[in-house]
Amino acid sequence: MPTTFQEIPRERPVTPLLDRADTPAGLRRLAEADLETLADELRQDLLYTVGQTGGHFGAGLGVIELTIALHYVFDTPDDRLVWDVGHQAYPHKILTGRRDRMLSLRQKDGIAAFPRRSESEYDTFGVGHSSTSISAALGMAIAARLQNDPRKSIAVIGDGALTAGMAFEALNHAQEVDANMLVILNDNDMSISRNVGGLSNYLAKILSSRTYASMREGSKKVLSRLPGAWEIARRTEEYAKGMLVPGTLFEELGWNYIGPIDGHDLPTLIATLRNMRDLKGPQFLHVVTKKGKGFAPAEVDPIGYHAITKLEPADKPVAPKKPSGPKYSAVFGQWLCDMAAADNRLVGITPAMKEGSDLVDFSERYPERYFDVAIAEQHAVTFAAGMACEGAKPVVAIYSTFLQRAYDQLIHDVAVQDLDVLFAIDRAGLVGEDGPTHAGAYDLSYLRCIPGMLVMTPSDENELRKMLSTGHHYKGPAAVRYPRGTGPNAPISGDLEPLEIGKGVVRRQGGKVALLVFGVQLTEALQVAEQIDATVVDMRFVKPLDEALVLEMAAGHELLVTIEENAIMGGAGAAVGEFLAREGVVKPLLHLGLPDIYVEHAKPAQMLAECGLDAAGIEASVKARMAKLGL
């Protein structure tokens, strides 16, 4: 196995067993004794594939053995296998007939980064966000019961995803309806238990066996006739198991808990899964794995190797790096530290995105004011609301796509009470290879309809810093949405002064057309304006809208064009149109933004071009409308 990133193979490794087992039917024809070798081959093939394409890395390496065991024991796709989030599903894709397409992973018109129902019958449920698998598998299990179908439903969920309330809602419901399903906890952070070894594996085999289950049920029937005897026996059993396994919580929720077992021990996995396959009711298997298993750098640094970029060809000349600005998330991280130094009321909150949202420095400099609430977006928002009630100034750093999960809390717990909570909304707009489940396509639409909400869209790095300060000083809920990646390298001022609320800026004065830009498409709009002699306005604020400036532009131009990287329906452009309609102003309007589709995964530049939001697309759309109007 390679020991460094550069040693990842650039040519497909020789894999004679995997060549025969790239479908579950082929896998089941292998002897059980061959599966260890198959796991080695699959791990090498995964390293090769992701090395060529880039993508999620560590989680897949950690579930090689579990994936093999699941498809070996269960009759997939008839038995329903649901992966939570989907970061770990690359080995599943390789083993379910898509190996020959893996080099198109996360590329335009290629296979998706996550399980997709439209891609394969083995992808029983589309995922991307966390903590949905148990609910989905439970729904499938109950549907199977209603159809008198004996198929099994299996959910595979990580220990991080299990922190979300939705997962526990499903666990609680499953025992109430006595669902015939299996939940597998993929514990790859060892945050729940380190109790793994020969004794634990042996105990798991015993507790999951049909003999044990039948003896347990028989004893229950006998002892239930004796007053108090069954309760004593039950507590004795729980005490004995509790000394060896940490399953009390799940047992109390009504699940038959087995484990923890070593998730890289194929014989134990297969024996345990075979036993549990035949058990009725809600079954819970705790499997401990190592993220990045088999690739030393990923084992040492599972966060850094959660995902990787693709390998460059060995003979590719090193091109000089083009100067670029800092990432927008880095600008936010620096502002957070600066404002924290100036205002000791500031606290930073994130739902498990410390690295992605660039809160690492803040967490180290202000540990007592930093709160990672885990994958719990609803809790994050109401937690912030509670702190705001007591005079704190919470900043919730959250991805646009994940804020959708806390919309009720945003309205009910923050906005209705007019609390001072600032939402730093990262990954707004199109995010690229992760596709539609991760796109921040709707935040302007769902934020601007909330009374009292301040909504801002920076056009560059300096504007982001100023808007964050504006939101921090605002009395009430505020949101700043900014994209993934770097900006145009605008000079950044070091001050913390706010902007004048609700005021846009004319960046270029032109002729008959005015381009009203909400966000980072300002750079492209300025390029287009040079070709068609247009006025360009950096609108800055979606709410409150600079109504005076909109009226001025309408009076002085023959066509208004709104530009935003958000859904056209209900977005910033719609706000302009609604305002003009209220004022009785009739003016030709062209709205450019994200169409009413789910934009499929591709490179960000390809996605913008597909939506007509690159410079060429904007210019073509404006010229077409100008021609139609005779301008």
UniProtKB/Swiss-Prot annotation:
Annotated Gene Ontology cellular component terms: cytosol
Binding site for thiamine diphosphate: 87, 128-130, 160-161, 188, 295, 377
Keyword Magnesium part of the UniProt annotation: yes
SUPFAM superfamilies: Thiamin diphosphate-binding fold (THDP-binding), TK C-terminal domain-like
Keywords, ordered alphabetically: Isoprene biosynthesis, Magnesium, Metal-binding, Thiamine biosynthesis, Thiamine pyrophosphate, Transferase
Cofactor: Mg(2+); thiamine diphosphate
PANTHER family: 1-D-DEOXYXYLULOSE 5-PHOSPHATE SYNTHASE-RELATED (PTHR43322), 1-DEOXY-D-XYLULOSE-5-PHOSPHATE SYNTHASE, CHLOROPLASTIC (PTHR43322:SF5)
Similarity field: Belongs to the transketolase family. DXPS subfamily.
Its biological purpose: Catalyzes the acyloin condensation reaction between C atoms 2 and 3 of pyruvate and glyceraldehyde 3-phosphate to yield 1-deoxy-D-xylulose-5-phosphate (DXP).
Protein's name according to its UniProt entry: 1-deoxy-D-xylulose-5-phosphate synthase
Organism: Pseudomonas entomophila (strain L48)
Name of the coding gene: dxs
